[in-house]
């Protein structure tokens, strides 16, 4: 099973709590995180894009770096780990994304890929005067379908004459082209999102579910597997989890309860309000899960709370789910969390037993 890190491009990572570590996003922090992840044989690093935060006492995600420029910098200071940036497709023409991706492919030596997002938080785009209207909620995957076709044209042939409802290319050119086929990823959880991923993505991200219920996402992975069967493509699921680990189960649970007790209710109210704006995409979208009050303090990603052995066991359970090809991990404290994962958790995981130990590497 592949392991990736969801780097904290926004302040405070993924804990909306006054009791969680409070920090600003910087290149130096993310460089240290990704270099440490590479040291411990993580397979990939992904950054999101966020253009407006949730406010509140913690000013949650009010402070964000930009994804492509951050990942270009990280590509230059790493050598093995796969690097993914996120394109907010309403803000960037596909021909520009195609050229930026080809540039980072050159920087990284073929280790770069692109995560495509349609955009769900209306104020992010309205503040710039580029929100296309609420009808977009029901047409966003039509838009993304045209977008990715332009990308594939330009990366594959260096030229596009695509004509659609949203984009018109007139002998559009991009050169040099990427040195290897460019991987495209998506995070579709609605039926429309999964249909898109089944047709165009190399793999699809989905949320884990619940606390210490590592296989609860299995129905989502099964839906993705079924959608991919309809297109005859192999599109696996990569599952988002937060790891909160300590020497014992009780110590880890104490940390988790402490974070929950400090939940930033003002920021969480903003998230809930925004999640209700899209009335056209159905009830199974990512944002609806994010705003669920069950565990909104960490945006309702699957949460693995326990001793190092318990977390290793739960991750092995994730790997046993049909269609689950990888996990995307966040941590309450990224630098210490990745080190602890590499030293204490990963060596206990059966699904990572193929990796050399750090002692073997030094020898």
Swiss-Prot record:
Q: HAMAP family annotated for this entry?
A: RutA
Which residues are listed as membrane-spanning?
none
The record's family statement is: Belongs to the NtaA/SnaA/DszA monooxygenase family. RutA subfamily.
Q: Name one Pfam family in it.
A: Bac_luciferase
Q: InterPro entries given for it?
A: Luciferase-like_dom, Luciferase-like_sf, Pyrimidine_monooxygenase_RutA, SsuD_RutA_monooxygenase
Q: What induces it?
A: Up-regulated by the nitrogen regulatory protein C (NtrC also called GlnG) and repressed by RutR.
From the UniProt record, list the reaction(s) this protein catalyses.
Answer: uracil + FMNH2 + NADH + O2 = (Z)-3-ureidoacrylate + FMN + NAD(+) + H2O + H(+); thymine + FMNH2 + NADH + O2 = (Z)-2-methylureidoacrylate + FMN + NAD(+) + H2O + H(+)
Residues recorded as binding FMN, renumbered to this chain, are 49-50, 115, 124, 140-141, 190
Give the record's keywords alphabetically: Flavoprotein, FMN, Monooxygenase, NADP, Oxidoreductase
Q: Which GO terms describe its molecular function?
A: alkanesulfonate monooxygenase activity; uracil oxygenase activity
Purpose of the protein: The FMN-N(5)-oxide reacts spontaneously with NADH to produce FMN. Requires the flavin reductase RutF to regenerate FMN in vivo.
As recorded in UniProt, its EC number(s) are 1.14.99.46
Give the GO terms filed under biological process for this record: alkanesulfonate catabolic process; nitrogen utilization; uracil catabolic process
Q: Does the keyword Kinase apply?
A: no
Protein name, please?
A: Pyrimidine monooxygenase RutA
């Amino acid at each position: 099973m592949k392991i990736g890190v969801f780097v904290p491009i926004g302040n405070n990572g993924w804990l909306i709590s006054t009791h969680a570590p409070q920090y600003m996003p910087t290149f130096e922090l993310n460089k240290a995180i990704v270099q440490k992840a590479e040291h411990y044989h993580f397979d990939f690093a992904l950054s999101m894009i966020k253009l407006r935060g949730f406010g509140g006492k913690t000013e949650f995600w009010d402070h964000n770096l930009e994804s492509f420029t951050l990942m270009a910098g990280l590509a230059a200071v790493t050598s093995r780990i796969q690097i993914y940036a996120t394109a907010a497709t309403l803000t960037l023409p596909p021909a520009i994304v195609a050229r930026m991706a080809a540039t980072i492919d050159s920087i990284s030596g073929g280790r770069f890929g692109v995560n495509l997002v349609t955009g769900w938080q209306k104020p992010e785009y309205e503040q710039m005067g580029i929100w296309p209207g609420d009808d977009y909620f029901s047409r966003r995957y039509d838009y993304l379908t045209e977008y990715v076709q332009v990308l594939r044209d330009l990366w594959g042939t260096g030229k596009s004459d695509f004509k659609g409802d949203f984009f018109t290319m007139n002998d559009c050119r991009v050169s040099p082209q990427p040195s290897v086929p460019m991987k495209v990823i998506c995070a579709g959880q609605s039926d429309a999102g999964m249909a898109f991923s089944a047709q165009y993505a190399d793999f699809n991200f989905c949320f884990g579910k619940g606390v210490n219920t590592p296989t609860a996402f299995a129905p989502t992975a099964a839906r993705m597997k079924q959608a991919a069967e309809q297109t005859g493509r192999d599109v696996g699921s990569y599952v988002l989890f937060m790891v909160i680990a300590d020497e014992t189960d009780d110590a880890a649970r104490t940390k988790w309860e402490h974070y929950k007790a400090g939940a930033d209710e003002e920021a969480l109210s903003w998230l809930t309000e925004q999640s209700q704006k899209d009335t056209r995409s159905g009830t199974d979208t990512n944002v609806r899960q994010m705003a669920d009050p069950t565990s909104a303090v960490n945006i309702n990603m699957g949460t693995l709370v326990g001793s190092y052995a318990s977390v290793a066991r739960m991750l092995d359970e994730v790997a046993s789910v049909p269609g689950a090809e990888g996990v995307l991990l966040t941590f309450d404290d990224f630098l210490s969390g990745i080190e602890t994962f590499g030293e204490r958790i990963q060596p206990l995981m059966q699904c990572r037993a193929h990796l050399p130990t750090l002692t073997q590497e030094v020898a």
